[in-house]
């Protein structure tokens, strides 16, 4: 499973816009992460992992 698929699964019923705001990225950046078109910076990976109470490794590797 790609990290984009994992992010979509973790997002659940929330909109991309809602999650993007909660994590502190733009909606377009979040959409690109889900489509595997862009890889988040390490700092953003950590914020995403913390938001979902997961490790960076669980989501991105």
PLM region spans:
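Key DNA-contacting residues within the recognition helix of helix-turn-helix
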Residues: 31-32, 41, 60-61
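DNA major-groove recognition helix of helix-turn-helix/homeodomain DNA-binding modules
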Residues: 43-58
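A short, Lys/Arg-rich alpha-helix, primarily the initiator
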Residues: 1-13
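Short coil turns linking two alpha-helices in DNA-binding domains
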Residues: 26-29, 41, 55
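Generic structural marker for isolated residues within well-ordered, non-membrane alpha-helices
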Residues: 7, 16, 45
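Short alpha-helical DNA-recognition segment
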Residues: 13-32
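Residue-level signal for the short linker/turn that defines the boundary of a DNA-recognition helix
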Residues: 13-15, 40-43
């Amino acid at each position: 499973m790609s990290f984009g698929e994992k992010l979509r699964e973790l997002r659940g019923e929330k909109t991309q816009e809602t999650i993007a705001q909660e994590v502190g990225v733009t909606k377009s950046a979040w959409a690109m992460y889900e489509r595997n078109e862009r890889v988040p910076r390490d700092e953003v990976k950590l914020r995403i992992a913390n938001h979902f109470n997961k490790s960076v490794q669980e989501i991105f590797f």
